[in-house]
């Protein structure tokens, strides 16, 4: 695409920065690449395909804001409350084509974030999302399993700046802590458990009786099967048994972590024509699961991440040594030129909390890495649980 900053050509403007102003709201800064941008007109966001209206158009000089009617090719201008994000391209309807976006580094250093004195976490989430609009290198996620809100950036200083902005712009003082790790539990030993739930009171009672084989398998989810013969347990109670097992498997016996790689086969049981109910069989299945976790030698699984590390050639040995101390392993390496190497590795997530800081220190700020979840592996005996 040829760009010559001709103000007579159709509009093309690039959103290169977004500022979250606590009083004005969102301010989008644009470079007019060609054509002219006029207040009050509509343009097409080439990135999203949506038509947006240009509201108040501003010229920024330091902290001074001057309202203007139009901006020409080559100018820098700002628009308030624009429905666009950093890296979006605004175009005239007759010439819609997005400009190449700026590539930002990915967040690699995460911390759990909460309001220091407690309070409305929803307001905190809203304030952080405002920061994300102006800083694409920040990331915000809610881990529903560990019940933590996490903010990610490029390092500790980056997150310190984000915390300072939350306080100065939105009046929110936050505290940050090490994230919890989402462990799993599994069993070593196959067991057969018989469980009976029987409760008698005035009127109808409760009766559910199950015999279940528990064993490990390769899948991540709980697998439920049935091999009941002769109608010992009526088919209409099978879903209740499965539901009882699934709910019980959400909390294991070691640390209350979800139980995975578990196959449960209902092989026998009994029922009462009057007292049996879905609730009774659900309860009996839950009791059987708890007994299983006592006898089947449960153990912990930890998440392992795949890493792509970019580092100077002469720092390979130092980084590999750090990975080894963090129970990591190197899978391979590729030369990418310019005196840099890409290192492919794996390491437990629990060992990567401050890896971004260590990598930056070793490589004098030249190293960077990305990570993604790979699988769950058995936690070595004696290893500290970070939860």
Regions found by a protein language model. Give the residues of each.
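Structural and coupling elements of P-loop NTPases
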Residues: 1-387
